[in-house]
């Protein structure tokens, strides 16, 4: 469970990215955060694993107060939270298999992982994660030889190998073509359904958010302006979140 209690975030330049946010995300939910660029979506997402520390309020993950965490307790929190980025964050010159193995780094000493001394169990976990994502045959291919969609699947496999309870996805399909986007979103649905992992994703394309997420969080100018089931989102709701009708490039317009 993730709880925001009167959470605010002000950056050093004075920009108030989050304003008194109160919300609870339950275990196993698939939540999409939507809103204009600069609304505070990424700040909200990255506050959960303290990539962007909050300024005030309280943020709890499984009843642990994230705010004071540092050192080993913070590393343990981040071990339980997978992170997917728009840019994939793979080591391009490494094999797919070794990239996925890095999901196990937090379970071992720096010395062992620096020299690639992963136990057999970790290697099995990495291969199983690749199999789950349907790219086991690419295990020993260099990451930079894969398509964008395949690279994002490797990133998701890396998160699976981490054995997290929560996966945070920051615009995970923004750099993909429409067809590949649908394939990757289906992968997120599979992870959520088959493993019961909580998925919290920032989404640029509203129709994708409504199709795949069961719950929508709308952020506007740092404020929480909507929180409810995706089935309850209508045109009036979107105007409330975006302040206007949606532009064409915010609608993906691709059917599965």
Task: Please tell me what each predicted stretch does.
Residues 178-180:
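Helix N-cap at the start of a conserved alpha-helix in ABC-type nucleotide-binding domains
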Residues 163:
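Conserved catalytic motifs of ABC-family nucleotide-binding domains
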Residues 49:
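Helix-to-loop junction immediately C-terminal to a conserved catalytic motif
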Residues 64-65, 108, 112-137:
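Conserved ABC ATPase "signature" region
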Residues 142-146, 150:
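Conserved ABC ATPase signature
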Residues 167-170:
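Catalytic Walker B motif of ABC-type/P-loop ATPase nucleotide-binding domains
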